[in-house]
Regions:
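N-terminal Rossmann-like FAD-binding beta1-loop-alpha1 element of flavoenzymes
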Residues: 3-30
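Active-site substrate-recognition segment that forms the wall
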Residues: 19-23, 81-83, 193-317
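Glycine-rich FAD pyrophosphate-binding loop
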Residues: 23-43
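Dinucleotide-binding Rossmann-like beta1-alpha1 core, especially the glycine-rich loop
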Residues: 47-124, 237
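Flavin (FAD/FMN) cofactor-binding and adjacent substrate-gating region
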Residues: 93-161, 166-167, 172-173, 303
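Predominantly flavin-linked oxidoreductase catalytic cores and closely associated redox partners
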Residues: 145-223
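C-terminal catalytic lobe of FAD-dependent flavoproteins
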Residues: 283-374
Length: 374
């Protein structure tokens, strides 16, 4: 029987999984030593993009499409604005690249999209430079999630459904879990602990944690998240979204950053990364050429060598499951990923082999190299 579930970690993976176990009428205890919105967590931050394009990978495309529907349901349950579904675009620099393969996949899955000429894409933004674009892939049902509000909404839903919560440090000792020297009873444990995975389970040495910078630029009217699509540029390595809560347009430089030890290092932004952001935003959106920076934030990515997640039982103690290495893509799959993990555990099923605890081929480009389309 799997009636008594422990979920360690209150980030997006942990809360989504706990929520789905609770919906399945299981007893759930959440454990986390940090506050829900602590900035050390990989799930911290104000916003995340949600999109369905994943090149040829139907699993990820289908999962994110289901997650978007789940987020809309959670909005209705909580009566809170969580999902700005104003679309998301891909600025394609070639005709037969990542974006084209994504288009074929989402078409196959009946996920709505538009293949726009660069000129037509100019209607989506108050200012847009298009001379270096071949086309623009527009996903009208993608957009921006208010990440902090999403975490709080899920956490409060879990409590409303009867979840127990322990604000404490969980210790893995062989097949058991202790908090404050007290053994906790459970049938199944899910460890969703982000960058701490490699510290609690040292045999999982493939995980790398890197520092990544996001820059918020002072924005004129018309650049709010509810008015413009979020955006991605794979060739140049950028992603961003409109202004949320007056913070300014967000731009992230999505090239693998410096490695980072969550237990030792301080988080400091890279001047090079910030300069790349400043140059790009003025290029792509000319109205921002002289824009002031409102804020710079440094977060961490937790990644495997091939950028696929870890979703697997412990090799020696199979009642412990380890999930994580979200590579900053947890929110776009969150509730649907939680359902996937819950179904695996309750139905005694094996996860997709790409999520296994195995050696993986290094892909230096991270998620942009993840989906092979040769």
């Amino acid at each position: 029987m799997k009636e008594n579930i422990i979920v360690v970690g209150c980030g997006i993976f942990g809360l989504s999984t706990a929520f789905k176990f609770l919906q399945a009428k299981k007893k759930v205890t959440l454990i986390d030593p940090l506050p829900i919105l602590d900035s050390l967590k990989s799930s911290s931050g104000e916003s995340r993009n949600i999109r369905f394009s994943h090149a040829n990978d139907q699993f990820y495309s289908r999962l994110s499409w289901e997650a978007a529907k789940e987020w809309k349901k959670i909005e209705k349950i909580t009566n809170k604005k969580l999902f700005y579904d104003t679309g998301i675009v891909w600025f394609a620099a070639e005709d037969n690249g990542w974006e084209s393969h994504s288009e074929k996949t989402i078409k196959m899955l009946n996920i709505p999209y538009q293949h726009l000429s660069p000129k037509d894409a100019m209607k989506l933004y108050p200012s847009l430079h298009i001379d270096d674009l071949h086309f623009v892939l527009h996903e009208p049902h993608g957009g921006t999630l208010a990440a902090k509000k999403c975490l709080l909404a899920l956490f409060n839903l879990c409590l409303d459904l009867g979840c127990d919560y322990i604000n404490g440090q969980a210790e893995f000792i062989k097949n058991d879990i202790y908090v404050n020297d007290k053994r906790i009873d459970f049938d199944t444990a899910v460890w969703a602990i982000g960058p701490w995975i490699k510290h609690v389970f040292p045999f999982i040495d493939m995980i790398k944690v890197t520092m990544q910078d996001v820059v918020f630029f002072e924005s004129p009217d018309g650049w709010e998240a509810e008015k413009i699509p979020a955006f991605n540029d794979i060739k140049n390595g950028f992603y961003g979204c409109g202004s949320l809560d007056g913070m300014g347009v967000k731009l992230g430089y999505d090239v693998k950053g410096q490695e980072f030890d969550i237990t030792q290092n301080e988080r400091t932004h890279s001047e090079s990364s910030v300069n790349h952001c400043r140059k790009y935003i003025g290029h792509r959106f000319p109205v921002f050429k002289k824009a002031k920076i409102n804020l710079i934030k440094t977060c961490q990515y937790t990644m495997t060598p091939d950028a696929n997640w870890i979703i697997a039982p412990h090799p020696e103690y199979p009642r412990h499951w380890i999930i994580g290495a979200g590579s900053a893509h947890g929110f776009k799959h969150g509730p649907a990923l939680g359902q996937y993990v819950t179904d695996l555990i309750l139905n005694n099923e094996d996860p997709d082999p790409k999520f296994a605890l195995m050696e993986r081929q290094e892909r230096p480009g991270g998620w942009r190299d993840l989906y092979q389309y040769e």
